[in-house]
């Protein structure tokens, strides 16, 4: 595991170094201006330099944070911090239900990691983001969010971990039925967590107001219906209390979807641009990207569970990481610990798959862009993406190797070039059809009016 962590750190540092060298930034800015005239006003020299400084600072902070986090993980897993916390919990509460004791000890380890990362989160918010005009959060809100996050962990993760520990205790033996039950439990927990996050957790941190009736709401409802979906709700989130960033997302299970718009998005983008952004999100559902990601998650979970069942029943795994108090008699109660160790071992090597997973994700993003261009038009989509890129101080010209390894979304120039390849006759076809239908309807009404006038009765019904 240490070798995997060391190798991933070396590769990440090398890619970050390559990215800081630059890769024809100003040449690419010039190409953006040729693709669309709006780019010349959005990506001024001052704005581009600010984005570069922001991204450089973000990378430096992330590398330092990752180094400290890796050190904490090593301390927790290799040098006995996690076993010491577990031993302390069971020593302090000798009659505690084993599954609950494991859940509490895992929460305490997680809490320690949260506290280690807290200074970096503070620096990111009140130094990096603040200096570049991205932060809207007060220190009081930061403290409240941190406390809420810890309380949510206690309320949700501890019972969930205890339930997982119980399932593994009862079904964690190396049998086909045990494997099927564990896999089914973990797969089913995904949609459950999504529902809890949507209806409970997110509402603890943000306010969601229904989008006011008007032309934008009608356009969003229409584009959903055209694609066989229904907007269960269209809401505006008060993201501007915390950040100047803009975005939107669509989520939900089945044909009923919930559209969430950041309040800053409504301020900075036109209605047609917002429709284009939502069309992109609808494209992910329509093109079965969400289904693919769920199946991908199931496949990864299946492999993880298979490895975990094999390892978590091996006493030597626990002893290797300092859990000397685990014995053949009490091992079933500690299988959740073994499961966590197995996942950590997998994580130290699965980073090798990052380029492949990133490539698949970027490909799906381009497909969703093409879908949105056909639904809402190429021009609104291009201008909306450029505005999002400029507002969020996103990197304009990352190093190709850095982008291949780390970027789940294409950088702005490849996205705009791909959108340009959408045939003009397909661009905004639904918008054109709607305009054509309106014109046709108007001509029919005028013809009917002329016929009625010709009756001589003087009435227009």
PLM segments and residue spans:
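Short, contiguous hydrophobic alpha-helices characteristic of membrane insertion segments
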Residues: 337-346
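Polar-ligand-bearing catalytic/cofactor-coordination segments
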Residues: 1, 10-333, 347-461
């Amino acid at each position: 595991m240490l070798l995997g962590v060391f190798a991933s750190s070396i590769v990440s540092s090398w890619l970050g170094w390559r990215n800081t060298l630059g890769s024809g930034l100003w040449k690419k800015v010039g190409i953006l201006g040729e693709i669309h005239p709006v780019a010349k006003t959005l990506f001024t020299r001052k704005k581009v330099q600010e984005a570069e400084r922001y991204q450089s600072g973000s990378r430096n902070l992330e590398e330092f944070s990752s180094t400290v986090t890796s050190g904490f993980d090593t301390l927790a897993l290799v040098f006995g911090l996690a076993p010491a916390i577990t031993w302390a919990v069971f020593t302090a509460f000798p009659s505690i239900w084993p599954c609950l004791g494991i859940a509490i000890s895992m929460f305490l380890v997680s809490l320690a990691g949260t506290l280690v990362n807290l200074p970096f989160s503070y620096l990111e918010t009140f130094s990096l983001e603040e200096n570049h005009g991205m932060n809207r959060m007060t220190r009081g809100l930061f403290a409240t969010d941190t406390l809420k996050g810890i309380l949510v962990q206690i309320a949700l993760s501890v019972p969930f971990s205890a339930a997982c520990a119980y399932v593994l205790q009862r079904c964690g033996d190396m049998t086909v039925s045990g494997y099927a039950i564990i896999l089914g439990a973990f797969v089913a927990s995904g949609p459950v967590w999504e529902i809890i996050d949507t209806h409970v957790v997110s509402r603890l941190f943000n306010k969601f107001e229904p989008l006011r009736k008007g032309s934008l709401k009608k356009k969003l409802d229409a584009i959903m219906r055209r694609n066989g979906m229904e907007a269960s709700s269209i809401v505006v989130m008060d993201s501007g209390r915390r950040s100047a960033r803009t975005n939107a997302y669509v989520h939900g299970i089945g044909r009923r979807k919930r559209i969430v718009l950041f309040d800053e998005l409504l301020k900075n983008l036109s209605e047609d641009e917002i429709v284009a952004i939502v069309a992109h999100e609808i494209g992910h559902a329509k093109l079965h990207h969400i289904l693919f990601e769920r199946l991908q998650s199931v496949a990864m979970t299946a492999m993880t569970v298979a490895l975990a069942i094999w390892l978590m029943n091996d006493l030597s795994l626990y002893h290797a990481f300092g859990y000397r108090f685990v014995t053949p008699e009490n091992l079933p109660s500690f299988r959740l610990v073994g499961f966590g160790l197995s996942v950590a071992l997998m994580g130290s090597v699965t980073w090798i798959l990052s380029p492949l997973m990133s490539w698949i994700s970027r490909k799906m993003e381009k497909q969703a862009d093409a879908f949105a261009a056909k639904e809402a038009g190429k021009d609104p989509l291009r201008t909306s993406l450029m505005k999002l890129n400029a507002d969020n101080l996103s990197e304009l010209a990352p190093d190709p190797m850095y982008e291949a390894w780390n970027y789940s979304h294409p950088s702005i120039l490849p996205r705009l070039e791909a959108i340009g390849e959408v045939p003009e006759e397909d661009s905004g076809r639904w918008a054109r059809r709607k305009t054509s239908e309106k014109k046709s309807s108007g001509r029919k009404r005028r013809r009917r009016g002329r016929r009625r006038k010709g009756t001589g009765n003087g009435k227009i019904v």
